[in-house]
């Protein structure tokens, strides 16, 4: 059966933020929860919603899904390109081949990890997009960011149970966290493991839920941290901040926060890596006779000597006037490309001077007063 579009399962767009995905998940999981919805098909929809959030709610798993169009476990069998240069532990953080075979045969190498649902589990990773001014990406900056993340509920200490009570062993999976399901496949009937839909893999049921967190063990809180943006970052680059993601379960560590940098364009410069590009307009007199001009750089104005006879498109290199190299080794260069501007409005004296120049050069002048010499001057 074709794999479902996980974004459609949660009813969100593909460019939805992590907060939008989380809100959609909460809404749908509550709507289809077997304890609240006894309509036919509600349990299957509840499972689908949980499976979709398992992938889209995790920054790394979501990126992998967006790239390959399938969940991590299936990509391992996607041909020579399915591994993408990643190690075998890169299938979305939930294990690699062991979990794949375990899902088919109900045990295997991955069974040892699944046999202990109360083991500490790391929290989800989060993404944060930071927009930088062009100059801030060049020189770096220190700033404070604020975002929402799931933190351990202070009321129940993360257990999800009402204070004074404790979770009990799950009545459906008997504490295993997973149930065995018989599935018809092209290879015949096979047993597979699925997360228990009652305890959601914890092996425990909460009879009296915490009023603060509703039994989840976590609450959404606003979290602020100081961030040092390194000098030389570029559009689309990421920086990982360990343990700044969401809280883990069963005493597990926090996930990580991945900051994705977005850089605003500059009105003066363009950039490619550590190299800065600048277009310098000069007039044809400067190009023909030469000149010394002031040139903008991200480090301040510098003088540049324009040799006589410079042509449009000539590029000069200013060493060390580019962006810092992110991993050290100084700055890149600035490339200055000359653009010769031809005057469009001339007074009588200027026209006569150009006609005299044209005559001395043996060039023809158009009868309407506009010299064909102008076209040649564009390339002086």
UniProtKB/Swiss-Prot annotation:
Pfam families: DnaJ (PF00226), DnaJ_C (PF01556), DnaJ_CXXCXGXG (PF00684)
Alphabetical UniProt keywords: Chaperone, Cytoplasm, DNA replication, Metal-binding, Repeat, Stress response, Zinc, Zinc-finger
Cell compartments where the protein resides: Cytoplasm
Cofactor note: Binds 2 Zn(2+) ions per monomer.
Essential cofactor(s): Zn(2+)
Domain of life: Bacteria
GO biological process: chaperone cofactor-dependent protein refolding; DNA replication; protein refolding; response to heat
GO cellular component: cytoplasm
Zinc-finger ranges (CR-type): 140-222
Residues reported in the UniProt entry to bind Zn(2+) 2: 170, 173, 196, 199
Database matches in SUPFAM superfamilies: Chaperone J-domain, DnaJ/Hsp40 cysteine-rich domain, HSP40/DnaJ peptide-binding domain
Residue positions binding Zn(2+) 1: 153, 156, 210, 213
InterPro entries: DnaJ, DnaJ_C, DnaJ_domain, DnaJ_domain_CS, HSP40/DnaJ_pept-bd, HSP_DnaJ_Cys-rich_dom, HSP_DnaJ_Cys-rich_dom_sf, J_dom_sf
Positions annotated as CXXCXGXG motif repeat: 153-160, 170-177, 196-203, 210-217
Gene3D superfamilies: DnaJ domain, Heat shock protein DnaJ, cysteine-rich domain, Urease metallochaperone UreE, N-terminal domain
UniProt main location, coarse: cytoplasm
J domain span: 5-69
PANTHER family on file: CHAPERONE PROTEIN DNAJ, DNAJ HOMOLOG 1, MITOCHONDRIAL-RELATED
Functional summary from the UniProt entry: Participates actively in the response to hyperosmotic and heat shock by preventing the aggregation of stress-denatured proteins and by disaggregating proteins, also in an autonomous, DnaK-independent fashion. Unfolded proteins bind initially to DnaJ; upon interaction with the DnaJ-bound protein, DnaK hydrolyzes its bound ATP, resulting in the formation of a stable complex. GrpE releases ADP from DnaK; ATP binding to DnaK triggers the release of the substrate protein, thus completing the reaction cycle.
Domain topic, free-text comment: The J domain is necessary and sufficient to stimulate DnaK ATPase activity. Zinc center 1 plays an important role in the autonomous, DnaK-independent chaperone activity of DnaJ. Zinc center 2 is essential for interaction with DnaK and for DnaJ activity.
Family assignment from sequence similarity: Belongs to the DnaJ family.
Assembly information from the UniProt record: Homodimer.
Protein's name in the database: Chaperone protein DnaJ
Natural source organism: Lactiplantibacillus plantarum (strain ATCC BAA-793 / NCIMB 8826 / WCFS1)
Gene: dnaJ
